[in-house]
Curated annotation (Swiss-Prot):
This is 2-C-methyl-D-erythritol 4-phosphate cytidylyltransferase. Its EC number is 2.7.7.60. It holds the Pfam family IspD. HAMAP family: IspD. The record marks R157, K213 as: Positions MEP for the nucleophilic attack. The gene is ispD. Catalyzes the formation of 4-diphosphocytidyl-2-C-methyl-D-erythritol from CTP and 2-C-methyl-D-erythritol 4-phosphate (MEP). It comes from Escherichia coli O7:K1 (strain IAI39 / ExPEC). The keyword Transferase applies. PANTHER family: 2-C-METHYL-D-ERYTHRITOL 4-PHOSPHATE CYTIDYLYLTRANSFERASE, CHLOROPLASTIC.
Length: 236
């Protein structure tokens, strides 16, 4: 797919199962309203005019995606994902064409706001390394004693942020950092951690705390509430 330097490709790793949801259906295929969580997440990306192409990495044995309208969307490419998130992202990057910048967004994070996305995308004008949406930690944080559910000490929350998605980086830089980190056995929990491993310092762009990831059963009702409220606000 041809792109310009202003166009962005989004990669959505959707090969996971999400056992903490305690359902037989992978969480990205659970429904909120008349759409799956995955559809909500992808449509939020495509709503921005700079996002011209979305690559979705699914499990090789996935039979559910083909049943969605997304399967026939002209701006969407599907690739086989890997066992780990980083493997799926790398597979997505290989299908990202010549886009200079890429977004990586959780398949199960359906409540992305357009103003947050716009501020994140603006980093391509000011940064060479990109950045992530994140929310400052507001709760008191406790460190547990090793191997015990007992408090070791309170962690200073000043300067602590919850990492969110999307995360936004130059495509080649992200590819090189992910590849190096995996080859060297580094623990990669998100895309920013791969850049950190390679000595880069991505920017933090404050995003809304209601941009939640559906991970546990109780998150589904909360995401439905946030989405319903957002749709109501947009229509009034």
């Amino acid at each position: 797919m041809a792109t310009t330097h202003l166009d962005v490709c989004a990669v959505v790793p959707a090969a996971g199962f999400g056992r903490r949801m305690q359902t037989e259906c992978p969480k990205q295929y659970l429904s909120i309203g008349n759409q799956t969580i995955l559809e909500h997440s992808v449509h939020a990306l495509l709503a921005h005019p700079r996002v011209k192409h979305v690559v979705i990495a699914i499990s090789p044995g996935d039979s559910r995606f083909a049943q969605l309208p997304l399967a026939n969307h002209p701006q969407i490419t599907v690739v086989d994902g890997g066992e780990e998130r980083a493997d799926s992202v790398l597979a997505g990057l290989k299908a990202a064409g010549d886009a200079q910048w890429v977004l990586v967004h959780d398949a199960a994070r359906p409540c992305l706001h357009q103003d947050d996305l716009a501020r994140l995308l603006a980093l391509s004008e000011t940064s060479r390394t990109g950045g992530i949406l994140a929310a400052p930690v507001r709760d008191t944080m406790k460190r547990a004693e090793p191997g015990k559910n007992a408090i070791a000490h309170t962690v200073d929350r000043n300067g602590l942020w919850h990492a969110l998605t999307p995360q936004f980086f130059p495509r080649e830089l992200l590819h090189d950092c992910l590849t190096r980190a995996l080859n060297e056995g580094a623990t990669i929990t998100d895309e920013a951690s791969a850049l950190e491993y390679c000595g880069f310092h991505p920017q933090l762009v404050e995003g809304r705390a209601d941009n939640i990831k559906v991970t546990r059963p109780e998150d589904l009702a909360l995401a439905e509430f946030y989405l319903t409220r957002t749709i109501h606000q947009e229509n009034t």
